[in-house]
Amino acid sequence: MPCEGTENTLAQSIARQIVDVHPTGFGTVDRKKLDAALMFSQQASQAASMCADACLNEGMIKDMRECVRSCLDCADVVDATVKCLSRHAGWAESAVPAILTAAIAALGVCAHESARHASMHMHARLTAETCRKAETACSELLESLTK
């Protein structure tokens, strides 16, 4: 079992190792930006799923309805994005820019909605922070693809 805090580094290095030995080499994609987008997106998807569940268990479910919806939408869109980023398909010419754009939007909405509840619920604060990191990483990767 890995030491505490090493799980993300391990996952990142495995993704990087596979990219490094992939027959296409993933073309000219910026590997550091790809690594960051994959790592932070995986974290955001997990945080959003867990936050939705936590919201459902709060006493004020009516107030949390939009947070639950945005978290579930975010998790689904970001999961699909991670899958697309994990395979090389021509990148700029493929659906990758479109799905990255969708992920950036979903992450932004989830971060905004979660932040509205952050002062009362720690899970919402953590989700908002994690989604913002993933939003930034995905934006940077998208920008590098469209240059």
Question: What is the predicted role of each segment?
Answer:
Residues 2-147:
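Amphipathic alpha-helical hairpins
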